[in-house]
């Protein structure tokens, strides 16, 4: 299904120039086109979802960017525990590291693989909410590795996210003026949207 994301502009590379009035068209897992909104709307149309040759329209008060790359992905997901909201009274809501994490491991509940997996899923949600579109591993804990794979976030050794190009992966973030991620799209899937 085609989706036309109408935004205030597109920044195809991190810290690159902003193309005001540009938009992106997503076709499955790929970026079908990047260009001025009016041209894309004329070429792809907008209308009811599923209508032949017509794109669904999503409008955002932000700009499309490649998103952010998390170089410390392994440390954030394997050396920190992201508490369940039901644990907030006892553990707080911020990730636990160092001695607090060691003490948690010594507790009666301990840190079995299932708990690491749940922690990683919550950590990944935090990353997606921040507009993260790639991260660096390697991930040695099986439950964490599984959570990362299921999230769809690409594991990359590089210094940053890939530039946005027509025909390239539909992986990007939409950010507000203050840098807040409004939405994160990974391989064409809207995986996070700020309410």
Predicted feature residues:
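Non-catalytic sensory/regulatory segments that transmit input signals in bacterial signaling proteins
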Residues: 4, 28, 103-107, 118
């Amino acid at each position: 299904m085609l989706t036309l994301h109408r935004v205030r502009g597109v920044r195809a590379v991190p810290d690159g120039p902003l193309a005001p009035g540009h938009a992106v068209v997503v076709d499955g897992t790929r970026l079908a086109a990047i260009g001025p909104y009016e041209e894309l709307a004329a070429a792809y149309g907008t209308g009811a979802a599923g209508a032949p040759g017509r794109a669904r329209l999503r409008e955002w008060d932000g700009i499309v960017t490649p998103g952010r790359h998390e170089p410390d992905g392994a440390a954030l997901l394997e050396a920190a525990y992201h508490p369940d909201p039901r644990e907030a009274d006892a553990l707080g809501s911020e990730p636990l590291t160092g001695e607090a994490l060691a003490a948690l491991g010594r507790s009666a509940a301990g840190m079995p693989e299932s708990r690491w997996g749940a922690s990683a899923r919550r950590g990944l949600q935090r990353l997606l909410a921040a507009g993260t579109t790639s991260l660096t591993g390697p991930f040695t804990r099986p439950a964490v590795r599984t959570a990362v794979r299921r999230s769809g976030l690409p594991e990359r050794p590089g210094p940053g996210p890939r530039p946005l190009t027509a025909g390239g992966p539909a992986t990007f973030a939409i950010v507000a003026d203050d840098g807040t991620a409004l939405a994160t799209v990974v391989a064409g899937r809207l995986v996070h949207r700020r309410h």
